[in-house]
Amino acid sequence: MSTNATGPLAGVRVVELAGLGPAPFAAMLLADLGAQVVRVDRPAGAGAARQDVVNRGKRSVAADLKAPGGRDLVLELVERADVLLEGFRPGVAERLGLGPAACSERNRRLVYGRMTGWGQQGPLAKVAGHDIDYIALSGALWASGRAEERPVPALNLVGDYAGGSMFLVMGVLAALLEVGRSGEGQVVDAAMVDGASVLTTMFTALQGMGVWGADRGTNVFDTGAPFYEVYACADGRWVAVGALEPQFYAELVRVSGFLEGAPDEVRYAQPAPADWPAHKAIWERLWRTRSRDEWTALLGHTDACVQPVLDWAERLEHPHLLERGTFVEVDGIVQPAPAPRLSRTPGAICRRPPVPGEHTREVAAEAGLDAAAIDALIASGAVMQA
């Protein structure tokens, strides 16, 4: 592990009010890039912290936000912070005395990042929900799946992480840049339903251009096209095919032996949408003539755009990912390495995930509290040292 003192965000101080999912992941991304992240956990928080790699690179303070002493400690941290991240329902942080107004009163340069599903305003703002609900309203869920079958979510990647965490990080970094010009912080209202909707921008454009149909599973990217599909092989495992461009499709046809013996003008021409079902049936039969690994050996290093569908364990052993170090082992835990990769100030995993409250004394002292004051807070139950 590295201290990552030279990461691109070295010196940026982040306070994360502990929650689940997107906000902690956003804080992890900032920590990977060198930010000094202090996670404020609940005093009763426990569990398998060592395995929760979303908390890597962070220090942990355990504080009861409903107790005046716990809240006041967080406000002391806010005075010295550049960023605060929270993922509560709208109004909760305000009721705790830790909303944007209270925090900006202590630090006018603070970037206040808010992660919610529905956003801070709107009829659903205070309604419970999860990734699947947010992508349902965005239209992203409707488009995911096969023809005449139910929509299928891609885990909780689209709403929580792509539409949530990534947009929160982007907003925070943009606001930090703006602070350098204005000297004033601001609130970043990152709603997963907004982010997921932005992710559908290209498909919105394609619909407007008349080249994307309303029916699921009938278009190029939604498994309608035979050259952009997942196919079962002879051993029951799968290959992913993405031969979109004509030259890549021609390579796929040539190397795989598809329609061998047919005239070139028939064999190498990408089929029109009306012919997709018939061509897909032929491809399905062909893919079942070899195992996944046999197809990978034949096509994986060509421009046919074919790769094996790997499970969680297999991905760790793929030669390309091994050479790039896409997964690393830190403190005995295998996990994805920081991304993206910067040439001069790369990201790094600077510390293992903390036990809740592991750094309470250390962080409180850095905030200016003396030993007696820290002891009093611990004795009152407002904070906890693990």
Q: Model-found features: residue ranges?
A:
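Flexible, small-/acidic-enriched active-site or ligand-binding loops
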Residues: S2, G332-A376
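Conserved small-residue-rich beta-alpha loop and adjacent elements
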Residues: T6-G45
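A short, aliphatic-rich alpha-helical micro-motif
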Residues: L9, L75-E79, V127
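A structured beta-alpha segment of the ubiquitous adenosine-cofactor-binding alpha/beta core
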Residues: V15, V54-R106
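Active-site-adjacent "lid/gating" segments in soluble enzymes
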Residues: L29, L33, E94-L244
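Glycine-rich phosphate-binding loop and adjoining beta1-alpha1-beta2 segment
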Residues: D32-D64
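Aromatic-enriched alpha-helical interface/lid elements that frame and gate functional surfaces
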Residues: F227-T302, V306
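A glycine-rich dinucleotide-binding beta-alpha-beta segment and adjacent secondary-structure elements
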Residues: G300-C350
